[in-house]
């Protein structure tokens, strides 16, 4: 009897693991994504993409930390497009890189993507997309609202990780 229970338990856990792995999870409908597409997959272009992403994350953190709704976030992003372009330009200049770039905000296509073991469906999503150069390289993406991947960037350039669930609970339930 004990062996049967163990066997059934193992089958149950395998079933759950299989279902979780193969289910699609979606980012909430009311979300704003952020994407940086590299010029190419060369080491140099991927490094440039990373530096642009990091510079913009600092700006986003400062601007969006006061946002409580998707409308707040949308307005902040729309009103700061020139600031994002300036940040990209300054970052490229610091790297001594002369490269075209495009900044667009609106509905943009995202391919199916796996992030931290969760598969997100492809589709058109409201997003801020930065395309560097030819935009033929690997991309970075995350979600600006709700702040699923926002990192708190401190002034000394250290990155501190926060607990998303706690932050969301504090912000939306406790109104901190």
Model-derived features: where do they sit?
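Early exported N-terminus immediately downstream of N-terminal targeting peptides
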Residues: 30-78
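Aromatic-capped interface at the extracytoplasmic side
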Residues: 19-29
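Amphipathic, coiled-coil-like alpha-helical scaffolding segments used for oligomerization/assembly
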Residues: 72-111
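Hydrophobic membrane-insertion alpha-helices, especially the h-region
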Residues: 2-19
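Structured segments of extracytoplasmic/periplasmic soluble domains
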Residues: 39, 55-67, 83-95, 151, ...
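N-terminal post-signal-peptidase region of extra-cytosolic proteins
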Residues: 114-115
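Solvent-exposed coil/turn segments that connect beta secondary-structure elements
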Residues: 37-41, 106-108, 133-135, 145-148
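Soluble extracytoplasmic domains of inner/organellar membrane proteins
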Residues: 118-172
